[in-house]
């Protein structure tokens, strides 16, 4: 393949070799080859339709690009750093193959709008994949919720025992979070799904192009409305990376819980051996490497977002070479999010729940204390007074090595004469859980209804 610069007419000296290597992006943007070829074929078809280039050339261009696609997919295409990027590598090879017709492909187009198109096409496909992986994770969560209906565990605030909840309720909390993550991805897709091709370098083109025709070929519902904006901004990539950062934050929180729950101190869950590793020195160890790595990779995704925000923060309109730095953080974010979601969906689907340990933990720490306060309120006591009474009751229990169910009726009535025999029915774990039956609560029937609602909407 010739390494002559396609933009070299103005220059009298060759590019310094290190400058070529420093400015080239082919090592990472070659993953855009399919989108670049698809966009070029659509552009050529439009040029032919508009009579800007002969239809005979369109046929040669299309056939040549399809052959290049097969060569790349078959590992037979040699990429050149001297040709800088995926666009120039493909165009140079095309011209080498088909001659003069290949040189007409770039009519009415700039690399500025070409790369904006390629990234949108690529990211559009990747968002669909990310959404599919989110669906798999939600399926795993729902499956665990259904298999473990009725399993009671402690709910926490400040990582201190707060109130008993259903394990299924906890799983469905993550279903809500990851469902919103999918919604953010869909919102991002809706805003980015516009065609930038036709914006030219920055001001449009003097040729009578038909942008709407290209949009139809490439399945874009509309075209961008300002040529400067079309090539200047990467907010669509930033929006995806911001949504990905929130998604990874949710995965990281879940990871932290699984790490804690799998310790010998909690023993709430057992992660499958296939998702854990051992120690090189301690033979007893079973380390939760997968959730630990996902937790760690969350910072990587945050860093990618900040990197691109920093690149874009002071750029004058329109295109600047700084924007070449958009791809590596974007691609890394895509790869990290997809990998994390896939492995998490599989891991959650295979984890085993230690129901006895969860229940035993829920029975400790005065988890039904709020139920006693609510009981007194229903007996006519103001809530703040009830709170005070129960606080003193808990202090008494701590001093005497007792828990709430251990108290006799006489001991209860020493704190309030409003307390009767019915107090004992209010402080069981099942009673506490099922009393919270308002929409969004942890009551068994409410959780069942939420599972059914989510499944019906999928």
Curated annotation (Swiss-Prot):
One of its GO terms (molecular function) is argininosuccinate lyase activity. One of its GO terms (cellular component) is cytosol. It comes from the Bacteria. It is an enzyme of class 4 (lyase). Keywords: Amino-acid biosynthesis, Arginine biosynthesis, Cytoplasm, Lyase. The keyword Amino-acid biosynthesis applies. This is Argininosuccinate lyase. The gene is argH.
């Amino acid at each position: 393949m010739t390494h002559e610069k396609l933009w070299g007419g103005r220059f009298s000296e060759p590019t310094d070799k290190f400058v070529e290597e420093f400015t080239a992006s082919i090592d990472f943007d070659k993953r855009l080859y399919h989108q670049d070829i698809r966009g070029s074929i659509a552009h050529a078809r439009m040029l032919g339709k508009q009579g800007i280039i002969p239809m005979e050339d369109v046929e040669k261009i299309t056939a040549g690009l399809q052959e290049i696609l097969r060569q790349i997919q078959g590992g037979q295409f040699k990429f050149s750093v001297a040709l800088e990027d995926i666009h120039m590598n493909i165009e140079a090879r095309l011209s080498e193959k088909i001659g003069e017709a290949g040189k007409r492909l770039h009519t009415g187009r700039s690399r500025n709008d070409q790369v904006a198109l390629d990234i949108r096409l690529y990211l559009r496909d990747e968002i669909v994949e990310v959404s599919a992986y989110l669906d798999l994770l939600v399926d795993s969560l729902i499956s665990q919720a259904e298999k473990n209906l009725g399993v009671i565990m402690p709910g926490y605030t400040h990582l201190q025992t707060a109130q008993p909840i259903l394990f299924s309720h906890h799983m469905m909390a993550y279903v809500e979070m990851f469902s919103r993550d999918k919604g953010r991805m869909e919102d991002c897709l809706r805003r980015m799904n516009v065609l930038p091709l036709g914006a030219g370098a920055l001001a449009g083109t003097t040729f009578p192009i038909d942008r709407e025709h290209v949009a139809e070929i490439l399945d874009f519902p509309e075209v961008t409305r300002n040529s400067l904006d079309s090539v200047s901004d990467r907010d669509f990539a930033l929006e995806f990376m911001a949504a990905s950062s929130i998604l990874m934050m949710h995965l990281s929180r879940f990871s932290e819980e699984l790490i804690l729950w799998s310790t010998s101190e909690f023993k709430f869950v057992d992660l499958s051996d296939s998702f854990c590793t051992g120690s090189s020195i301690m033979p007893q160890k079973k380390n939760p490497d997968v959730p630990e790595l996902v937790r760690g990779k969350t910072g990587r995704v945050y860093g990618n977002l900040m990197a691109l925000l920093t690149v874009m923060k002071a750029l004058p309109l329109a295109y600047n070479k700084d924007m070449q730095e958009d791809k590596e953080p974007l691609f890394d974010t895509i790869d990290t999010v997809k990998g994390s979601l896939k492995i998490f969906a599989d891991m959650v689907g295979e984890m085993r729940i230690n129901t006895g340990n969860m229940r035993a933990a829920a029975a400790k720490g005065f988890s039904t204390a709020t139920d006693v306060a609510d009981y007194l309120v229903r007996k006519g006591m103001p809530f703040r007074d009830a709170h005070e009474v129960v606080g003193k009751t808990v202090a008494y229990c701590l001093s005497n090595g007792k828990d709430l169910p251990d108290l006799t009726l006489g001991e209860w009535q020493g704190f309030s004469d409003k307390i009767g025999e019915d107090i004992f029915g209010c402080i069981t774990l099942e009673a506490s859980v099922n009393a919270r039956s308002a929409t969004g609560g942890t009551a068994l029937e409410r959780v069942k209804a939420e599972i059914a609602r989510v499944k019906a909407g999928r």
